[in-house]
Curated annotation (Swiss-Prot):
Keyword Ribosomal protein in record: yes
GO biological process: translation
UniProt keyword Ribonucleoprotein, yes or no: yes
Keywords annotated in UniProt: Ribonucleoprotein, Ribosomal protein, RNA-binding, rRNA-binding, tRNA-binding
One family name in Pfam for this protein: Ribosomal_L5_C
Subunit (UniProt): Part of the 50S ribosomal subunit; part of the 5S rRNA/L5/L18/L25 subcomplex. Contacts the 5S rRNA and the P site tRNA. Forms a bridge to the 30S subunit in the 70S ribosome.
HAMAP family listed in its UniProt record: Ribosomal_uL5_B
Gene Ontology cellular-component terms listed: ribonucleoprotein complex; ribosome
Name of this protein: Large ribosomal subunit protein uL5
Organism: Neorickettsia sennetsu (strain ATCC VR-367 / Miyayama)
Molecular function (Gene Ontology), one example: structural constituent of ribosome
UniProt record similarity statement: Belongs to the universal ribosomal protein uL5 family.
Function: This is one of the proteins that bind and probably mediate the attachment of the 5S RNA into the large ribosomal subunit, where it forms part of the central protuberance. In the 70S ribosome it contacts protein S13 of the 30S subunit (bridge B1b), connecting the 2 subunits; this bridge is implicated in subunit movement. Contacts the P site tRNA; the 5S rRNA and some of its associated proteins might help stabilize positioning of ribosome-bound tRNAs.
């Protein structure tokens, strides 16, 4: 739904607000990266399996397990131990996820008042965290091993944060200020 809206009305609004004459020059979504960090995943294999399964349900494609790059003795972490999982969404799955995020997950999120400019990284990308992954309708609360948080990064082709904010607000991302 959001992808067809992108190609119809939102692209025209973005072009008008940014001030470009060609759709190729207009900023657009590139990818959405979802990641889950699990500190105790090396000692609890059921937690890792549950996180991979839940993230795969949310994203619509299989999540990849991330491993530690180096050993850190104070964290009882060895090189190669699993520490989380991640998935990168592009094209159709990206727009499906954004649609579910905006219209199903964020309205159910506790104390969510909108995004701010602090969510941007200075290069036109927006990152934020969700404290509970069970706000997505695909995840069954009864089958979840433990409630986990997740990081979401929306990568755009915009060169500045202002252009990215225009793009995201044209698609319905709520902003506070």
């Amino acid at each position: 739904m959001l992808e067809s809206e992108y190609h119809k009305s939102a692209l025209a609004r973005v072009m008008k607000e940014v001030g470009v004459d060609s759709p190729v020059k207009a900023p657009r979504f590139e990818k959405v990266c979802l990641s889950v960090g699990l500190g105790g995943a090396s000692s609890d294999s059921k937690l890792l399996a549950s996180a991979v399964e839940d993230l795969s349900l949310i994203a619509g494609q299989k999540a990849v397990v991330t491993v530690a790059k180096k050993s850190i003795s104070s964290f009882k972490l060895r090189k190669g131990f699993p520490v989380g999982c991640r998935v990168t969404l592009r094209k159709r799955r990206m727009f499906d996820f954004i649609n579910r995020l905006l219209y199903m997950a964020l309205p159910d999120q506790k104390d969510f008042k909108g995004f701010t400019m602090r969510n941007f990284d200075g290069h036109g990308n927006m990152a934020f965290g969700l404290t509970e992954h069970i706000v997505f309708p695909e995840v069954d609360f009864d089958k979840t091993y433990r409630i986990i948080g997740m990081n979401v990064v929306v990568v755009t082709t915009a060169s500045t944060d202002q252009l990215a904010r225009i793009l995201l607000s044209c698609y319905g991302f709520p902003f506070r200020d």
